[in-house]
Amino acid sequence: MSTFAIPRSVEWHETHVTILNQQKLPSVTEYLDLHTLEDVHDAIVTLKVRGAPAIGITAAYGLALAASRYETESVDEFQRRLKQDRDYLASARPTAVNLFWALDRLVAAAKSAASVNEAKTTLVHEAIRIQIEDEDVCRRIGEHALSLFHRGDRIMTICNAGSIATARYGTALAPFYLAKEKGIELSVYALETRPVLQGARLTAWELMQAGVDVTLITDNMAAQTIKAKNINAIIVGADRIAQNGDTANKIGTFGLALLAQSFGIPFYVAAPLSTIDLATKTGADIPIEERHPDEVTHLNGVRIAPEGVNVYNPAFDVTPNELITAIITEKGIVYGDYETELPSLVAKEEHHETA
């Protein structure tokens, strides 16, 4: 079994949360200490921390940190302020369902507390539990995903659904780390992922840290690369999965799914059950965040487009369920019939947790 480095993105301390500043990668490896609720909110908005699970973990720690400083003995007042701060953090990224899931889980956990001190302790323990669980979930996703690949396969991915987007291992990148552990050779082709370049800055960086074979391409090279390099499969992460399997992920994912269909290769989505939002019936109900035009018109602070040009900058797109070969979760692989199978899988997990 190989030993190698898998970078981590979030760490809890009693007085602050430490994150890997993903905006500075790959040129600078910088860790930031977040001391306030506003620090955490800003880190999420500005993509210093990104990736749905990592956002959820960071927000959970941020809420626990803020609550630890409430100066009240009233449980009712504590709960009121907790919900207010929950809503503030939830506004940071409207598409990432793990953000709401983690925050709501903390709020629910604190409800059973008989005192303010008990509630504060409960929040910290619950946030830590979310991170520990996510690492285990990601490893199990990786095991299931790895079962779909064969030694020597060439696999394409977009954005960064890796270790630094989660507690550890990642979702779409998890099988590559586990393959490395087991001595199974796989090759990864990573799209640069304009306009913020998560594929170039983050995916290529973290896979290289672990010694995984990775080749970087620009987004508009995907079709030619699939053809010329005989790509065997495409695997992506997810920011939100609707009840029917429609999947919101980084902009460009939908186009990759269409290419997979055209070339007759499988298109896999890897995500934890917490990313499945049963309250969202179809992809049409998923809000798509639009980001600042400067992300498109500027590169490293330098303008690369004419001043005043109109810009459309959606951060995500939605891949229809019929283009998805399978959704890989910690509880197994779902092939089609998502509208029935996904709620069933989530219900089984909820029953297991309450049993």
From Swiss-Prot:
Q: Where is this site: Transition state stabilizer?
A: 159
What role is this protein assigned?
A: Catalyzes the interconversion of methylthioribose-1-phosphate (MTR-1-P) into methylthioribulose-1-phosphate (MTRu-1-P).
Any GO BP annotation: L-methionine salvage from methylthioadenosine
Q: Which gene encodes it?
A: mtnA
GO molecular function per UniProt? S-methyl-5-thioribose-1-phosphate isomerase activity
- EC main class here is isomerase
Name the PANTHER family on file: METHYLTHIORIBOSE-1-PHOSPHATE ISOMERASE
> By what name is this protein known?
Methylthioribose-1-phosphate isomerase
Question: Which UniProt keywords are listed?
Answer: Amino-acid biosynthesis, Isomerase, Methionine biosynthesis
Entry EC number(s): 5.3.1.23
Catalytic residues, chain numbering: 239
Organism of provenance: Geobacillus thermodenitrificans (strain NG80-2)
Specify which residues bind substrate according to the UniProt entry for this protein. Answer: 50-52, 93, 198, 249-250
